[in-house]
Amino acid sequence: MSKLDGFIEEHDRESNIDSGARLESTKPSPKVGSPAQRVRQNGVKSPILQTQATPAKPSEQEHPLKETPTRATAGGKMTRSNTLKRLSLIQPVISPETTPKEHRQQQATRNRSRSVVSVHSRSSSSASEQLADATKDVNALLQLLANKELELLETKHKIEELKKTLTQEEKALLRQTHELQDLKTQVGKALNSGIDEQIQQQSQSSHHSPNQRSLAVPTSHTPGNESRPAHAKKESVWTKPLSFLNQFDQLIQHELEKKLNWDDVASPEKTPGAESGTLSGRSASPASYNNGNSNNNNNNNSNRGRPNEDVLGNMSSSLWSFVSDVKTGLLGINEEEEEESAEAPAVASSGESNNQLRFVGSKNNSEVELKEYNASKRQ
């Protein structure tokens, strides 16, 4: 026993107060307390990890400051009020019993449940945060998906529009190619029609002048005619008047032979002078023909003024002068053109100069020269 307990017992004896019963009645029921509560055991303070016990509210009867009537002693003496003050100063120390093992196990399970609940609350909060983040991520992914689908639709529309434009361009290209082919055919027809017309004109001119083919001299060996196709075209223009001139010359010669009674002379043939006239006259112009006609008219007028001594001689001289003037005029123009164009062969010019016929002398000598010329030709 401690000194304090002995002092309390002595005081109870003196004051005739049983404080032990009051202490037993004031024992609180064991409750769960905090683990930091300190308990006195045998006067030694030692920390014990124990649940904190909340003291119960004392009743009015158990309150230490309550005024309780003191019992009268045998001597009839009254106790002093100081005792009450002393009792109020001395607080009863309650030493609660240790908690049993079952209570400790229950407390541990409760703590565990609390810790589990706290952990669950923390995990639930983190899970809720994760769920919120996941929902946010899902929304973002859905938005991206929608945007991608819209982009794909736009690209598909663009591709369809490009295909439509491509088909339209292809149709336009085909139409243009058909138009080009039509134009080509039209141009070909126009050119062919022009060529056909030229061929027809040439064929008609060849039919109208059959004597030219028989009287024409082959000039395929001459390099001048091969190098100048334009000159050949110009010659073909004068084929008709030259053939007419050749026929006129033959008629004149035939009439002269009839009037002169040249029976021993053969039928009139084409003289070298006429051939030279036809060859040289191909490149002649109508101006030379007009000049020849004018010269012939002048000669005829001059011959008319002369005295008509012999009608036959006058006729023959006038005719042969006309022929000679025409031939010399044609040959002179041909020589000028040959001088301008240096591509003409020298052989053709020499042949033309050799084939010239000149009737020099009076009206009586012309017949003799013509007979000599025919005799030399037959030899």
From Swiss-Prot:
Keyword Ribosomal protein carried by entry: no
Record has Cytoplasm as a keyword: yes
Disulfide-bonded cysteines: none
GO CC field: cytoplasm
Compartment(s) where it occurs, according to its Swiss-Prot or TrEMBL record: Cytoplasm
Keyword annotations: Coiled coil, Cytoplasm
Coiled-coil region: 125-190
Biased segments, Basic and acidic residues type: 1-16, 59-69, 366-379
Chain spans, region Disordered: 1-133, 197-235, 263-313, 332-379
Primary residence: cytoplasm
Biased segments, Low complexity type: 114-128, 200-209, 283-305, 343-353
Pfam family membership, one: TDA11
Positions with biased composition (Polar residues): 39-54, 211-225, 354-365
Similarity comment: Belongs to the TDA11 family.
Protein name per UniProt: Topoisomerase I damage affected protein 11
